[in-house]
């Protein structure tokens, strides 16, 4: 029997005498797009950082492909709410820099070709030579997404990647993210507080309770057919009501 691609087994997180996350077990299979949905302060970003190897549970264990996670690794890429691009490098240079660290044996030509491919996938071929200061917030975040996919991680972690963007830009980037993911089928775990975003993007939605002592209170399959541009479809409306009811309790 194969191990789940990602597994958090009976993890807890405490700071001093305050328990932020009560015992929680999560399993995610390879190729799934899973959103963790919950109110502010419930610990959802803490869970994501445990999978990234940037934080560790107080008790319990976290595994990737059956191996304990003991720190960051090239098998996991992360996109934050703020892009974290290097300001002195171009859009393409930022992607190539990530590739140089993650894939040191690739030639310069190979890195250039990979960067071009992912810039094209996020619609930024025309902006390859621009530095971040000359890119809009949405364009900067597209570069961050392209950089994360370009290093070809087995697991992609998204921490509210579109939270700082306006509604129109956010929807555009959601659809571009879905397009890039569908071509790679990497395992994706995304943290969000946006119910519609979770419905548009996910195969599964894990709903967390209010803190302190948060835990996963529901594991909801998303059966809304693709494409999901219209979240006013009957199946999406029903799912939205279900998720909002869970978040209110």
Map each language-model feature to its residues.
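Conserved ABC ATPase "signature" region
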Residues: 107-127, 179
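The feature captures the beta-strand-to-loop junction immediately N-terminal to the Walker
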Residues: 37-39
């Amino acid at each position: 029997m194969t191990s789940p691609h990602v597994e958090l087994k009976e993890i807890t997180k405490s700071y001093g005498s305050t328990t932020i996350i009560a015992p929680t077990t999560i399993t995610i299979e390879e190729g799934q797009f899973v959103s963790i949905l919950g109110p502010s302060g419930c610990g959802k970003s803490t869970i994501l950082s445990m999978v990234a190897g940037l934080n560790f549970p107080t008790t319990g264990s976290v595994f990737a492909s059956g191996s304990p996670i003991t720190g960051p690794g090239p098998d996991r890429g992360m996109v934050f709410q703020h892009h974290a691009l290097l300001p002195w490098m171009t859009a393409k240079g930022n992607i190539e820099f990530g590739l140089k660290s993650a894939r040191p044996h690739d030639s310069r030509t190979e890195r250039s070709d990979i960067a071009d491919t992912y810039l094209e996938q996020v619609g930024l071929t025309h902006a390859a030579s621009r530095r971040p200061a000359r890119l809009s917030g949405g364009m900067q975040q597209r570069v961050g997404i392209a950089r994360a996919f370009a290093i070809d991680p087995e697991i992609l972690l998204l921490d509210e990647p579109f939270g700082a963007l306006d509604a129109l830009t956010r929807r555009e980037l959601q659809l571009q993210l879905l397009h890039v993911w569908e071509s790679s089928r990497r395992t994706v775990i995304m943290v969000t507080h946006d119910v519609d975003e979770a419905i548009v993007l996910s195969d599964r939605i894990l709903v967390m309770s209010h803190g302190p002592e948060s835990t996963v209170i529901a594991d909801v399959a998303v059966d809304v057919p693709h494409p999901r541009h219209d979240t006013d479809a009957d199946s999406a409306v029903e799912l939205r009501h279900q998720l909002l009811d869970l978040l209110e309790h």
